[in-house]
Amino acid sequence: MSTYVVGDIQGCFEPFQYLLERVKFNPDKDRLWSVGDLINRGPDNIEVLRWFYAHRDNVTMVLGNHDLHLMAVSCGARKPSRKDNLEDILDAPDREQLIEWLHFQPLAHFEDGVTMVHAGIPPIWTVQDTLDRAWEVENALQGARCEEFLTEMYGNDPHVWDDSLSGMTRLRVITNYLTRMRYCTRKGKLDFVSKGPQPIPDAVAGKKVAPWFSHKRRLTKGQTIIFGHWASLEGMTDDPKAIGLDTGCVWGNALTFYELETGRRITCECAKSVHI
């Protein structure tokens, strides 16, 4: 039995199918994890989502920002953006079944010493903090206030954690850490401007930022964390236990599988989506 973790697919079904065939994925004995962002910007969003739903007993995923955005658009909490191409899902006869399934997926997963999130874990949180706070958002997605949360989750404020936060502002910063974060200060203040492999100077006025996984005193130091979201890293980090798997498939770079038991990476080249 093997467990494979796939990076951000974003609707690129063909390279995903190619890698499944290349590793001889057997759903009767193998497992697939996903760092999220199953959909959006790629050509075959509905096919990716249907595959995951059909194999839901053998897959473990965490929600990414694009998955959350689909939920918001589908319930009318948000209008589609210019770059979205979610129509194949929104017009599908099985959309309600597929999107409801997404609502019950986690924002963080921990198993056998490995933590998986979409974007990262702020340096001021432990793994248990992460799981507990992810549950707060999961509870909102599955409850009566779901539409309110999906409306209020957009925005950059507050841009740093405070234990006293409550309500939708608390849920927003949790969501931003787990699904949007790249750079932050050592105390967890988010830099929403920098997206490349190097930070933009003074993106956070008067503060030094670094990739969330590079902070020497982060509370998850030494623990294995698998994440996606950050395509410009091309899977490279300065910490062997911070395993980045977004290798920019939808941007015309590559899709990556990571074999959990061996650390082996399997990649295939991708064509750039016309929706980028």
Predicted feature locations:
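N-terminal active-site segment of His-dependent metallophosphoesterases
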Residues: 1-51, 68
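Active-site-proximal beta-strand elements of phosphoester/diester hydrolases
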Residues: 2-10, 114-120, 244-245
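Short, conserved active-site loop motifs that form the nucleotide-linked donor/cofactor pocket
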Residues: 3, 30, 59, 114, ...
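Glycine-rich phosphate-binding loop signature in dinucleotide/nucleotide-binding domains
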Residues: 23-28, 55, 111, 219-220
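Active-site neighborhood of divalent metal-dependent phosphoester bond hydrolases
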Residues: 46-49, 54-169
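Acidic, His/Gly-rich catalytic cores of divalent-metal-dependent hydrolytic chemistry
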Residues: 131-276
